[in-house]
A protein has these predicted regions:
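Bacterial N-terminal signal peptides that target proteins for export
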Residues: 1-9
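Bacterial N-terminal signal peptides
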Residues: 9-18
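C-terminal motif of bacterial Sec signal peptides marking the signal peptidase cleavage site
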Residues: 20-22
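Short, compositionally stereotyped local motifs that mark structural "simplifiers"
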Residues: 25-225, 230-232, 239-243, 430-431, ...
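Beta-sheet entry/capping signal
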Residues: 59-60, 69-70, 121, 130-132, ...
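Extracellular and select intracellular beta-sandwich modules with Ser/Thr-enriched
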Residues: 142-148, 319, 423-425
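Middle-to-C-terminal accessory/interaction subdomains
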Residues: 165-167, 174-189, 194, 202-206, ...
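Conserved ATP-binding subdomain of kinase catalytic cores across diverse folds
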Residues: 169, 201-372
């Protein structure tokens, strides 16, 4: 019996060993799956991809290819020799405290002698940690090929920013903060400018919007390489990762702590176009913008998009826009309007015009096209000195410009009381170079409308102000055209429609409520970072509603009286 039990025990032991041995490959595979989630382009193995993690700390395991070690940083900077770990395999524990390198250098971006703008560090704001890694060879040389991962800890984008795209932009902090070349700082440009007579006068008067600084510089030389990650609403991993060029954009709003940006997609960055459904359509883009709101930056933030959205339906172009949240090197940078921008690609997509055949004039300069295309614009401007009440002359005018587009466009901008609109400011029109599209006639594009409809509670944007007469004074071609009875009839029809349909008070109220339902919950975090302005926001909303409540009964009689004179 004892021998029988011994034999049985041996059989059981062998069976267990066999089962364990058979399971070991599967157990090892599962263990590897927990450690190895993906292999980066530079060959480093990571346990975790970029994305959202419901943890206050995250342990990331990294392993280099054989013969290499790993250099890494967690502040957004590019790894160098001093960042070499001396190891080919290691763990790094990431936490919220590692984010904040840019805001920690806020003194480089603020200008207290000119304004009182704010840029605050607040640990309650959502944040991501930027983990940059590079390989180090046996000689200690650090590779230029950097892998950038961004880990957002203990944040749920879907709950925090419902309905918004989240855009994460990473770049070497020197591109933003360097004294000579950083695009977010006052920098060397400001220090040189403030010693000039013009600079001294601006500082004395505190007319901060006239200041010159690194962040007011324009052009390709001020474009910086960056890495972009885009999260759709509800996504926990990036839906897109792409390299691009980054510039500060805008006019006076460049001085704000929260600046607007333009993103450029070029072959030099690896992608000639961005192909992604930014606006729920799978489209290709050469360039897009993240707009802080311009004159509306610390007010509603959505006023430009709101005004343009209400105005849709006229024969003018309104580009797509949607709310987005920006993280800059993992740091919360607030809500923006993500906007489609003018380009030959955009016009081709919208209207089917060959990209090489598109001409866009912005603020009396060629924006898209050839230098000599300015002559086409000058041909239009020449009608300012002609008698458009003459039928033959007006017929020629109609061959050059789409008069329906012109009537609708001018009606819209006059009705909203646009106080920041002249031929050389925020005025855009386009055509095909030849006659293949719409006979080569000029059509209009709506651009930057937030300085309107009671903005700043100024007389310039008041519902009582005669913006019709202002347009006649500021736009010589419009002055000539409005004297023609046929064009006047088109314009009167268009402005009445704008007031009775597009900007009907009840419709404005409804649309305002809809926009505020999305944007309102985004503002408390914005205030934490860039300063409290909720009172101004409330006043702006009230002023906008008041404008449209009063506007029709004031501006329409003005236009009617003109026709009777």
């Amino acid at each position: 019996m004892k021998n029988y039990l011994k034999i049985l025990s041996c059989i059981l032991l062998l069976s267990i060993l066999f089962i364990v041995a058979g399971c070991r490959p599967e157990m090892e595979t599962k263990k590897q799956e927990q450690v190895i989630q993906y292999v980066a382009e530079n060959g480093i193995i990571f346990s975790h991809k970029s994305g959202l993690y419901d943890k206050t700390e995250l342990n990331v395991h990294m392993k280099a290819p054989e013969g290499y070690m790993i250099a890494f940083t967690t502040n957004g900077t590019k790894p160098s020799g001093k960042d070499a770990s001396g190891k080919s395999e290691l763990d790094v524990t990431l936490n919220r405290g590692m984010s904040g390198y840019i805001v920690d250098h806020k003194e480089l971006m603020l200008c207290p002698e000119l304004n009182n703008f704010v840029l605050s560090k607040d640990e309650s704001l959502p944040a991501g940690v930027v983990l940059n890694t590079a390989l180090v060879d046996s000689k200690g040389a650090v590779s230029d090929e950097v892998q950038t991962n961004v880990y957002f800890l203990n944040v749920d984008f879907a709950k925090k920013f419902p309905g918004c795209l989240v855009v994460s932009i990473t770049t070497d902090p020197r591109n933003l903060l360097d004294y000579k070349t950083g695009i977010l700082v006052t920098g060397a440009s400001y220090d040189a400018w403030k010693r000039t007579d013009a600079g001294k006068q601006v500082i004395a008067k505190k007319t901060w919007w006239k200041a010159e600084a690194n962040f007011t510089r324009k052009g390709k030389s001020w474009e910086k390489p960056c890495r972009i990650q885009i999260f759709k609403s509800g996504s926990v991993k990036p839906d897109l990762e792409i390299n691009a060029g980054l510039r500060v954009r805008g006019g006076m709003s460049r001085a704000y702590s929260q600046k607007s940006f333009t993103l450029y997609f070029r072959e030099e960055y690896g992608n000639k176009l961005l192909q992604f459904p930014l606006f729920d359509k799978n489209r290709e883009y050469k360039t897009v913008s993240l707009r802080n709101g311009g004159n509306d930056t610390d007010y509603l933030k959505f006023k430009d998009t709101f005004i343009q959205d209400l105005g849709k339906g006229g024969k003018f172009t309104v580009f797509d826009s949607r709310p987005a949240i920006l993280f800059l090197n993992g740091e919360y940078w607030g809500p923006y309007s993500l906007n489609e921008l003018i380009s030959d690609k955009t016009m081709h997509t919208l209207f089917g015009v060959d990209e090489n055949n598109v001409v866009v004039i912005k603020e009396a300069k060629v924006e898209v096209g050839k230098k000599e295309d300015i002559k086409l614009y000058e041909e239009l401007q020449a009608f300012a000195d002609k008698d458009l009440t003459n039928p033959e002359t007006y017929k020629k005018f109609c061959d050059v410009v789409d008069v329906r587009s012109m009537a609708d466009y001018f009606a819209m901008r006059i009705y909203i009381g646009d106080g920041d609109w002249t031929p050389i400011h925020n005025h855009v029109l386009w055509r095909s170079r030849d006659t293949s599209y719409n006979g080569g006639r000029w059509q209009f594009i709506v651009h930057d409308t937030e300085y309107s409809a009671g903005h700043y509670s100024q007389k310039l944007t008041s519902p009582e102000t005669d913006h019709f007469q202002m347009a006649i004074q500021n736009f010589p071609v419009f002055k000539a055209a409005i004297r023609n009875k046929e064009f006047y009839a088109l314009f009167l029809e268009a402005i009445k429609k704008a007031g009775s349909e597009n900007y009907r008070y009840s419709r404005v109220q409804e649309k305002m409520h809809s926009y505020d339902k999305t944007w309102g919950p985004l503002m408390p975090d914005f205030y934490k970072r860039f300063g409290e302005s909720s009172r101004k926001r409330k006043e702006c909303m009230e002023a906008t509603l008041h404008f449209f409540k009063k506007r029709y009964d004031i501006i329409i009689p003005i236009v009617v009286r003109f026709g009777r004179s």
